[in-house]
Every structure is written in structure tokens, then in C-alpha cells.
Curated annotation (Swiss-Prot):
It comes from Schizosaccharomyces pombe (strain 972 / ATCC 24843) (Fission yeast). Residues 390-402 have a biased composition (Polar residues). The modification Phosphothreonine is found at residue 285. Its main location: cytoplasm. InterPro entries: AH/BAR_dom_sf, BAR_dom, Endophilin_SH3RF, SH3-like_dom_sf, SH3_domain. It holds the Pfam family SH3_9. This is Uncharacterized protein C19C2.10. Residues 302-321, 329-414 are annotated as: Disordered. CDD domains: BAR_MUG137_fungi. Residues 309-320 have a biased composition (Basic and acidic residues). The modification Phosphoserine is found at residue 414. It comes from the Eukaryota. Keywords: Cytoplasm, Phosphoprotein, SH3 domain. It is found in: Cytoplasm.
Length: 501
């Protein structure tokens, strides 16, 4: 008890600056101890950082459909190999994916070998060195305790008034134990310093293994380059789409035929325009007049329908060949972004004259019928014009339409409900680009009043403005591009409010 109290008193006096005698050590010993402490701190940091490095490199994760866990680089290689094998029958470049995938898998095996060396050799030697330094710390604490006992007894003897043989004997024993532990501690520090070449050799072997790992990885990647991996690859041999129209007249240039991936459009507008001097219309057969009656609608569209159907058949055949050549990975080229235009029932209602159009609320059923009729193909253009003029003698003048706003025209009749109550209002679900002068250019969301249903594929209607009034823009549009207008639609409600007041 007295010995522990004396040791505590000695330690307190040294810490708080009391007059206590303390045994001093040599400069060589202090220098060696400082170097040993630096080694202990450094080796501990190296061990913790290398452990974290190996743990990150050795992370193995499995995909959702795989039970075995692999390195990320091995997963990458396996994915490339699977892609190449899947495209082996449909792509000439499948071997490229397989070559790169196998190289990545081999790099994964090299990484596993490198990590095995880190775990079994480098980190093992590092842990042994760290254990030796930590064992030295135990010897240091033992030496420090004996020093405190020795210094406490020395201070006690100096303060004693008379000599005591027992105190002197305890002092000699404490001195011997302190010198013994001091010698052991110093010898162990010297031994650890002599083992420094072994620690350096461990780092050199780590460097050599790193060079070996990266050199083999580089050789694998360069081997791909030497085998022509980096050369420019040819495009996949996809059969090109070619289109040919049946019986195209000589007066129509090839630039008037435009082919697109989703449809084929024959641009006939320039050839159907009237000649300014002779006032005659040129058509593929030189017999089609400028106006067409509804009775001969099917006869007039036979030639255009045949050409369009023939072109679409060629296009569908080419798309089918392309899909067969690409296998399962071919892109579905026949899927349009909007519904297909019903070309097989599309009437050819082309006209080159700007004719004033009544608002839908002022048009009678007779006007709508006459505006979309077609004469016989055997009749001459002049005779057909005279016939249509006699039938359409009730057409208003342009000034009567442009001077008065549509809202006032609606109110000039006592009961507009009788003319529009039997018709329906639709909203465009897709945008529509016209191909002839008789078709309306419409955007998604436009509201139209249906004037006439020509057939199941094409309707005639008048576009409504945002405030619900008639715009005077009348023409054809595909019926599968629109849906019935909702009763709570803002424009529809404005139209009903203006139309039924």
C-alpha cells in the first residue's frame, strides 16, 4: 500500500510541477524511442488504410438473377460475353463483344490473384510488425511503473532524518528492477529497428505484384488492339428501303416523290396547278378536272390508291426483311408515333382556286354536299366548271364573309340550333400535316365541328377558334386522329354558348 501511494505521489508531483526527483534518460535512448513511436503510429495507419483498400477491391456483388457473387469487373466481362453470344447469329460484330468480355473476365481473375497476395502476404507481414510494436508498448509501461517506484523511494530517503536500512534495501531492489526493464525495452527497440529491411522488402514485393497485375492487364488490352479490335467496324448490312410507284407520268419529276420511314407522299401540287395563260390543269392523265363530284369519288382515287398501296407494300416488305436480318434485336420500324392515315379510302379533293367558305353555322346541307362532289372523269374541265357553277349559285361573296365577324353572322339567323344541333364536335388527339390543298393543317388539341362524314376514314369539318367561334377554315381530316370533345372543355363550352344563344 505504501509502495503504491509513493508511486502515485511521485507521478502527481511530476505532472503538476512539484519538487520531485525524476530519473533522466540518455539522448540516444530518447532518439530511439521517438523513432519507435513514429513507426508505431505509421504502421497502424498503413494497416487500417490497406485493410480498407483490400475490402473495397474485394467487394463481390451478385445480380438479381444470379446467386454467385463476382467482382464488378468480372460482371462487366460476363455481360459483354452474353451480349456477343446473343448476337452471334444476327450481327457481324458479335465477336468484338465476346473478345472484350473475355479480356475483362481475365482481368478479374488477375485482380483476384492480386488480392490474395495482399491478404495472405502483405497484410499478414504488416500485422506481424504491428503486433511487435504493440508488444513493445507493454514493455514501456512496465519500465515506466518501475521508474516511478524507484524515484519515489529515492525522494523518501532524501527526506528521511536518519538512515534506515530497510529503505535502502527497497531502493536497491527498485533500482535493479528498473534497470532490468529499461534494458529489455531498449534491446527490443533496437531489434525492431534492425528488422526495418524486412519491412521495406515487404513494400518492394507489393510494388512488384502491382506491376505484374497492371502489366498483365495492359497486355490483355493491347492484345485486343493488335487483333484489330480498334479498327473501324462496318455497319450492319441492313437492306435499304427502295420505293417505286406504278405508272408515274413523265411530266412529274422525281423530286416530287418524297419517301419517309413511316409513309410515302406523292407531291403532286406543282403539276396540278393551273397554267396562267391557258387556264388548264395538268394531271397525270390530263383528264382530271379541278373539281370532283361525290358520285365518282371512288373512281377518281383508284390510281392514287394503287400507287400508295404498292409503295406501302414495298416498304412493309423491306421492313420485314430488315427485321429478319437483325433477329430479335431489330427495332420495330413500323410503329408510328400517331395512327396511320387511312390512305386506301382517302378522296382526292384537290382544287387550285381560293373559294370563299361559309362558316359552318351558315352552311346548309346542300352547300356541304356540293363542296365535296366530283364530276365524271370523261367530262371536260369547262363543262364540269359550268355544271358546278350552276349547282353552287348560292355561294356567298368574299366580302360578305370578311366584313362581319363570325359571332355576328351567327346572330343574324333566328335559329342556328337547327343547323348545328345534328353535328358533333371533336378534338384532335394528334397533329396532322396536310398533303393536299383540301386537307386542314391541325395541331393536337384543336377543336372542329364535323360537317360531313365522307367515309369511315375521312371527315369534313370546320376549325373552331379558342373563343369558340368559327374560323372559316374548312377541309378534310382523318377521323382516327380525333376524339369526341368533352362537355366541360373550355372551347367547347364557349362554342355552345355562342352557337345556341
Amino acid at each position: 500500500m505504501n509502495k503504491h501511494f509513493a508511486k502515485l505521489s511521485q507521478w502527481t508531483g511530476e505532472k503538476f510541477g512539484f519538487d520531485r526527483q525524476k530519473t533522466t534518460l540518455s539522448d540516444d535512448f530518447c532518439s530511439l524511442k521517438g523513432e519507435t513511436d513514429a513507426w508505431l503510429v505509421g504502421m497502424d495507419k498503413i494497416h487500417r488504410s490497406c485493410t480498407r483498400w483490400v475490402r473495397n477491391m474485394d467487394k463481390r456483388k451478385g445480380l438479381l438473377d444470379e446467386k454467385d457473387k463476382q467482382l464488378p469487373v468480372t460482371h462487366v466481362g460476363s455481360s459483354f460475353v452474353e451480349l456477343g453470344q446473343a448476337l452471334s447469329h444476327s450481327s457481324s460484330n458479335s465477336h468484338t463483344y465476346i473478345m472484350y468480355g473475355k479480356s475483362m473476365v481475365e482481368i478479374g481473375h488477375l485482380q483476384e490473384e492480386f488480392m490474395d497476395y495482399l491478404n495472405n502476404s502483405f497484410l499478414a507481414n504488416l500485422e506481424n510488425s504491428l503486433a511487435e510494436f504493440k508488444a513493445l508498448d507493454v514493455k514501456e509501461k512496465k519500465m515506466e511503473n518501475r521508474r516511478l517506484v524507484f524515484d519515489a523511494l529515492s525522494t523518501k530517503i532524501q527526506k528521511a532524518k536518519k538512515e534506515e536500512s530497510k529503505l535502502e534495501e527497497d531502493l536497491r531492489n527498485a533500482r535493479a528492477k528498473y534497470e532490468e526493464s529499461l534494458e529489455e525495452f531498449e534491446d527490443r527497440m533496437v531489434q525492431l529497428k534492425e528488422l526495418e529491411p524486412d519491412r521495406v522488402e515487404n513494400v518492394v514485393r507489393l510494388l512488384q505484384m502491382q506491376i505484374r497485375f497492371h502489366q498483365k492487364s495492359l497486355d490483355l488490352l493491347k492484345g485486343l488492339e493488335m487483333n484489330g479490335f480498334s479498327k473501324k467496324r462496318d455497319n450492319v448490312n441492313i437492306p435499304k428501303r427502295t420505293y417505286s410507284a406504278r405508272s408515274i407520268p413523265s411530266n412529274i419529276s422525281s423530286t416530287n416523290v418524297a419517301t419517309t420511314p413511316s409513309n410515302t407522299i406523292f407531291e403532286m401540287d406543282d403539276t396540278l396547278k393551273a397554267d396562267s395563260s391557258s387556264n388548264e390543269y395538268h394531271s397525270p392523265t390530263n383528264t382530271l378536272p379541278s373539281y370532283h363530284t361525290e358520285a365518282d369519288l371512288d373512281n377518281s382515287s383508284i390510281a392514287s390508291s394503287n400507287r400508295t398501296q404498292h409503295t406501302e407494300d414495298n416498304y412493309n416488305k423491306d421492313v420485314s426483311d430488315a427485321q429478319n436480318s437483325l433477329g430479335q434485336s431489330a427495332v420495330d420500324l413500323t410503329t408510328p408515333s400517331s395512327p396511320p392515315i387511312p390512305r386506301h379510302t382517302k378522296p382526292k379533293l384537290s382544287t387550285t382556286q381560293s373559294t370563299p367558305v361559309k362558316p359552318a353555322s351558315l352552311q346548309s346541307e346542300e352547300d356541304i354536299q356540293l363542296s365535296f362532289k366530283q364530276p365524271e372523269l370523261s367530262a371536260s374541265s369547262a363543262e364540269l366548271d359550268e355544271k358546278l357553277k350552276s349547282q353552287c349559285n348560292v355561294s356567298p361573296s368574299p366580302s360578305n364573309i370578311s366584313d362581319a365577324p363570325p359571332s355576328k353572322l351567327n346572330r343574324s339567323y333566328s335559329s342556328p340550333l337547327a343547323s348545328i344541333s345534328s353535328r358533333k364536335v371533336v378534338r384532335m388527339k394528334y397533329s396532322f400535316e396536310p398533303e393536299t390543298e383540301n386537307e386542314l393543317k391541325l395541331k393536337k388539341g384543336d377543336l372542329l365541328l364535323v360537317l360531313k362524314e365522307i367515309d369511315e376514314g375521312w371527315w369534313v369539318g370546320e376549325k373552331l377558334g379558342e373563343d369558340g367561334v368559327f374560323t372559316g377554315n374548312t377541309g378534310m381530316f382523318p377521323s382516327n386522329y380525333c376524339v369526341p370533345a368533352h362537355p366541360w372543355d373550355k372551347t367547347f363550352r364557349a362554342f355552345l354558348k355562342k352557337g345556341f344563344k
